[in-house]
From Swiss-Prot:
Keywords: Chaperone, Mitochondrion, Transit peptide. Belongs to the complex I LYR family. SDHAF3 subfamily. This is Succinate dehydrogenase assembly factor 3, mitochondrial. Transmembrane segments: none annotated. It is found in: Mitochondrion matrix. The keyword Methyltransferase does not apply. GO terms for cellular component: mitochondrial intermembrane space; mitochondrial matrix.
Length: 135
């Protein structure tokens, strides 16, 4: 993992943005902007920070890939049913796709004050467009 190149980071960045394509607006653009901002903020990270950054974003990407593939498989299995019963826009805000996962207790305890503030800000921003009742 110590031999990460700029191409590895670029590939991961692109994979994350590709995974975000399954999200409905405004979650997609919010997620894309968050990823872009994080990448810019970590351009001058130390090698140790860069490895941690890559590892955590790689975990996120793998979670998204697994969930995306599951959703795509489910949609392809139900494609005829969906096409026959739904003539509405595919990005209907009432049909949010639940992607991602909550942080566990260990992850929450490992966050520093700035990260907690950033997480709270992200929760606040996303709550304006998505609430648990939308699931």
């Amino acid at each position: 993992m110590n031999n990460l190149s700029k191409n590895d980071f670029l590939k991961l960045y692109r994979n994350i943005l590709r995974c975000h394509k399954i999200l409905q607006e405004p979650m997609r653009s919010m997620g894309d902007q968050y990823v872009k901002t994080e990448w810019k903020l970590h351009k001058k990270a130390t090698p140790k920070q860069a490895i941690q950054f890559y590892e955590q974003w790689n975990i996120y990407c793998n979670i998204l890939l697994t969930q995306r593939d599951s959703i795509l498989k489910e949609n392809s299995n139900n494609n005829d049913n969906y096409n026959n019963n739904n003539n509405d826009n595919n990005n209907d805000n009432n049909n949010f796709i639940n992607i991602g996962q909550d942080l566990n207790e260990k992850q929450m305890k490992s966050l520093n004050k700035k990260q907690i503030e950033q997480l709270d800000k992200l929760k606040s921003e996303t709550s304006t467009v998505y609430t648990p009742s939308d699931k």
